[in-house]
C-alpha cells in the first residue's frame, strides 16, 4: 500500500502471448493474467488512490500493432474485433467474481428500454 497518498494508475496494459495465433490454453492464461492484474490492483491500492487502468490498444488487429508487439495478440479483442477470453478476465477482475452466471444482458437491455422504443443495439 502506498503511504504517500498519491494516485496509482496502470497505463498501457497488455498481456503479450508471443504469437498472433494463440492456442485455447494461451487465451485462457491471458484471461487469467488480466483478471489477476485487475483484482490485485483493487486489493492492493487503497480505493482513494485508485486512478484507473488503461489498456494499450483495443484489438489484435495488425493496424493497431504496426510499431508495438507486431505479430502478437495482447489485447481484449481479436483482429476482427471479437471479444477474447481476456475481455471476460477484465470484467471478472473488475467485478471481483465470475460474472457469467449473473449476466444475460437483460439487465442492460431493461435499463435502456422505454415503452415503445427499441434498445440501442437493435
Question: What function would you assign to each model-found segment?
Answer:
Residues 1-122:
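Aromatic-rich peripheral "rim/lid" segments of glycoside hydrolase catalytic domains that contact
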